Design a protein with these regions (language model features):
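Coiled-coil dimerization/phosphotransfer module
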Residues: 1-114
Length: 114
């Protein structure tokens, strides 16, 4: 495929089943979108915990997103990703990366809110 993926992942990460599945699906959909649409040669994937949140960032060096699709999340895949994050009370952002390409950032609470 010619897509290089640079990963910065924690040595150990303990997530409940629902969050594990959500993160897997988010990364899967994001990489599928990059492969199909971005014409990218590299993706940087960072997964870390900060305070009580799981933080995921994917950045590619592709052609970028059509702003009309990101503004209102018109793409079915992007809407699905946002809904998946919203289910945990998280935050989902996607847009142009500085210097070109696309960056997606996700923050999900590590525990359910009471």
């Amino acid at each position: 495929s010619g897509l290089r993926i640079e990963r910065d992942l924690p040595d150990a990460l303990s997530l409940d089943r629902e969050r594990s599945i959500a993160v897997f699906r988010l990364v899967q959909e994001a990489l599928t979108n990059v492969q199909k649409h971005a014409r990218a040669t590299q993706v940087d994937l960072v997964l870390e915990t900060r305070d009580d949140r799981l933080c995921l960032r994917l950045r590619d060096n592709g052609i970028g997103l059509d702003p009309s699709k990101t503004r209102k999340l018109k793409s079915h895949g992007l809407r699905g990703m946002k809904h998946r994050v919203d289910a945990f009370g998280g935050r989902f952002d996607i847009g142009a990366a500085p210097g070109g390409g696309t960056v997606m950032t996700v923050e999900i609470p590590l525990t359910d809110l009471p």
